[in-house]
Amino acid sequence: RSGAVAQGLSAINTYIGNEQDPADYARMVSNDLMGITRDDLAYDTGRHVDDSVHLFEEWGLPIWKTLADGTRVDGARWPNEGGKLLVEGGTPVRSGKWQIMINGESYKWIVAEAAKKAIGMDNIQERVFIVKLVNDKNKENTVSGAVGFSVREDQVYVYTAKAILLVAGGCVNIFRPRSVGEGQGRAWYPVWNAGSTYTMAAEAGAELTLMENRFVPARFKDGYGPVGAWFLLFKATATNAFGEVYMDRNKEMLNDYPPYGQAAVPASCLRNHLMLKEMKEGRGPMYMDTVTALANLRKTLTPKEVKHLEAEAWEDFLDMCVGQCGIWVGENIEPEKKNSELMPTEPYLLGSHSGCCGIWVSGPTDVGAPTSEEHAEADKVPSHLPSGWNWGYRGMTTVNGLFTAGDGVGASGHKFSSGSHAEGRLAAKAMVQYCIDNKDFTPELDTSVDDLVSELYQPVRTYLEHKDYSTAIDVNPNYITPRMLQFRLQKIMDEYVAGVATYYQTNAQMMAVAEEKLEMLKEDAKKMRAKDLHELLRAWENYHRILTAEAHMKHIQFREESRYPGFYYRTDYNLVDEENWHCFVNSVYDKNTKEWTVFKRAHKDLVDKSKLFK
């Protein structure tokens, strides 16, 4: 799927370097995600991620450097001015403790070129939309293949495989977006991420984790432009309409959520929590104070450096969010003269940014992770699932042969592009080992090819059978268009499952209504039509979104607390309950009965978290 790196990036947000170590990284990840993450996964990513960044630079990604005299130069200049590669001891330009600046408008192309050379184009099939994983006929709890279709020609692909890497991104557009009408389709995360990772894994029998988690980024309003460089590199502050820095004005609120609000950098959701107070009490709109930030930088820079800095302010968007430049140009905004509005977005589900929903995977075996399940509700964990945090292959789900990385790996956020790539490398090596260990296994699909093709094309048949009933093909009592079905899903989630309509608030009664409406939506979804390949794509994206949305709702329903204030609030349990809910909420889906089983798994710290507060 075209993903988070496709439009480019202006920074790599996870690079450990010599200043920190993987344990520091695991601490940061844990605190930002309110204490419920797997240290084994974060630590493992932390000790491998720099290798991925070094590979990116070797393949041609321009990374900014700080020269020996302290001068900062971008990726185009340093090779001619005495700079070094990172692997040779070069010093990156850090915008924050973990982030390094890049010229990344071609980031994905550069990494993809390396993949093409390694694999060979003869072994790559593009524009094939995978809709379903297929379990094995003879070996229980094992994946053996997948089915998909070309979005360019009338062709279905059925694969068999011993090992499969499922990395189709996170989930966007299950909530009604802030950008509607002519802005439809503009989102912060890529709209092509349709929850396929989570739905296909769940239908294959994989255990999900922390699906209640979501990310609600505060971004430049309407364009969803990135704020990281402004906060970290340009040292800008966010204010209310009266110029007050809301993080200062409301800082006492952070003490309501110890210890996560008391770290040097409070958890992301809590920063939203403070912003939402301003909005609810009528002190909006919120602004990024670009004018003051650039004015302060001018005091210490030469006119030439100032001009370069202003260019970088624009390039920050051109590198990764061109639409935000359109907003600035269209609204006559010059950042040195006029501040820009900020706004928290609609919710997104992901496992690689400041979010940690995803799939429960096997971790490393050498960092002291639990190998058994010991807590008061351990008997409620389904008996067929493995105990502990590792069961043989790094990155493998609870389904044999099914691996994931990036947004797919739950309980370990803040991987971003580099960490996701590192997880992919770890999973790929484990997949090779799995295939070697299972060399005598011959995968056999548990569903016939004819049945798979029939299910895949059902929306097309629905259209062909009923299209002549009415004179307007979009208005027909026998089917619904994918576009309209998506609007229904977004309305349900927005109004009942803590979307922007309710300031991210929900309760048990609202979710009971959502549950009922989602059941009816699933019935209606069987009548989706597809008049062409594009609508067939949209129809299957909707099937994936609906099940992912249901998982999200079921997990919030089960977790009787508000673990992520600022991202969502349960008004009937509006607290962070460390005594009863400092745990993972996990689930499995039975594709035959269509029922979810949701349960707790114990949390355990593997690194000392107190260092954050010393």
Where are these regions (language model features)?
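Conserved N-terminal glycine-rich FAD pyrophosphate-binding loop of Rossmann-like flavoproteins
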Residues: 1-27, 228-230
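Conserved FAD-binding subdomain of flavin-dependent enzymes
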Residues: 15-63, 203-210
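Mobile, glycine/GP-rich and aromatic-enriched active-site lid/loop segments adjacent to catalytic centers
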Residues: 59-144, 210-413, 495-614
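Core beta-strand elements of the Rossmann-like FAD/NAD(P) dinucleotide-binding domain
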Residues: 153-163
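Short, well-ordered coil/turn residues at beta-beta hairpins
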Residues: 161-163, 167-168, 405-406
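Glycine-rich loop(s) and the adjacent beta-strand/alpha-helix scaffold that form part
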Residues: 166-225, 417-430
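Catalytic phosphate/nucleotide-handling subdomain of diverse soluble enzymes
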Residues: 391-460
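Long, amphipathic alpha-helical stalk/connector segments used for oligomerization, subunit docking
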Residues: 436-531
